[in-house]
């Protein structure tokens, strides 16, 4: 029995059913200050397609979201509405008794699947809803999502995953074998997280639209607050990139780590040449050097620029693409996204694939709500899957956290484990009232 042996608790859960839902198109005008600007996306308005699951319990709700950068957010909202109907009338216990059935219910509808499958707008919507159910389940238990997962046995963890299309790389039995050694020492690792936090890197200083003066000022401020890993956006103009990377390296010092992010703008030969020009600044990795779908292109780039690593994954649709990237050697840093993948279930699958191929997971964040999501993923990876955060850092950007009820807590450049129940993405009433998008306006 997945939910445990406490019969009375199971009865309580069985009494809680999903009775309805409400959706919101939330958009923040980040393009005004060029926050989030890069070579591919020069003027993003960070946005959330947000869903609230209502239940038969007056005080129990589930909150989920997926992230976009403005126009098109309404498409995700429409897809959420189409899929959410599949949850109405379902009990929380029925959905979570075998969590893989939740994933398949929302990704395998016999007609909606046609506009995927397991990719694009429909998968972003599925992620918002799957995450909302996990949020709801965790709130019922009065625990954060990371704690709910970290209390699972290896068998329960593996039972969350849809292994269809993965068994040539990872079987359920192999997953359990990977997890079993990590079931020892979990309490000590959790204590370490409460003491030290989980290491992060920041993109807050490196947006492409920032002036050199702004870059210096923000880098100095972040360095003083404890950050040692800095990412800078590149790819628009080589001479501009050379100057900006020089400015960042001067400001951050020789002992800090630099990462560069091209946001998919280069062809493969262009990427190789451009990265070689930037190599003197010693980037630890280059992110999204070409099309996010070009697995063999990433493989060619990785071979040409070694020992600089290739990082990708924020637009990797699903576990199957990640499997192929890892099998091919096309990535050396896995940047999974908690609402690009199909929610918690598929995030857990990709974590185990990465462990199987000995590839560090450094989740993508930065957009509204993403930092709040990924802190849970990184904690789970450390406590349950790998037992280390050596060579692992989770992305962080210092904006829009005031719009969620339980924002991330950073200390000395590290994520501190969230204590509030749920998945940390409940928006404030002020955010819903002040930033809900209406096309008439």
Role assignments for model-derived ranges:
Residues 16-19, 23-28, 48, 345, ...:
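Flexible C-terminal active-site loop/helix
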Residues 18, 59, 83, 129, ...:
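Conserved, mostly hydrophobic/aromatic
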Residues 54-167:
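Metal- or metallocofactor-binding catalytic centers and their adjacent structured scaffolds
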Residues 183-210, 306:
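N-terminal small/glycine-rich loop or linker at the start of catalytic domains
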Residues 197-215, 234-235, 263-267, 311:
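Active-site mouth loops of central-metabolism enzymes
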Residues 218-230:
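Catalytic domains of carbohydrate-active enzymes, especially glycoside hydrolases
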Residues 231-372:
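Catalytic core of soluble alpha/beta enzymes
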